[in-house]
Amino acid sequence: MSFEEKHKKGYELLHEQDLDMSLDMARELQKLNPEAAEGFTLEGEIMQKLDQWEMSIKSFDKAIAIEPENGRLYNLRGYSYLNLENVKESEADLNRSIDLSDLPTAHRNLVLFKLMNGDGPGAINYLIGRIKADPRDVENWILMGDLMKKGGHDEKARTYYEQALKMDPENEYARKQIED
């Protein structure tokens, strides 16, 4: 199996929740090419699934050392820092990710960062700005629905979920939220 095939297989295994086999693939990738970020990135994502946040950060550190301009890596590491409540590191990585790649997931993680740090109004305002900037991003509508629902605004939440369903009629999560 080639490097690319092992990389693809590693992510397939990760999505199937076969974390042991996926980790084996990550380690094989690292041995095949220790100068490539892919093996370390896959390992970091596996560690996130296992809630091994410190280990994931170590893996992402290695990947970032190889690819320092990869915004996705900063987003992944920022999310791990967020789960450890390492505020400064998380915010810096999420902002770096946005600066490098403007990833929608990094913006959503920044919303979570604001929420976890007690800035609910800032999180909502930021998310409203994201919805205005990219109204076709279904996940932003769903996240806003979740925030409204959590805040006890069920009717407002419903409108956000309905908007998400207009754009993605197959979205089971949004459908389930409306049915509940």
Regions found by a protein language model. Name each.
Residues S2-E38, L42-D51:
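Alpha-helical segment of the N-proximal tetratricopeptide repeat
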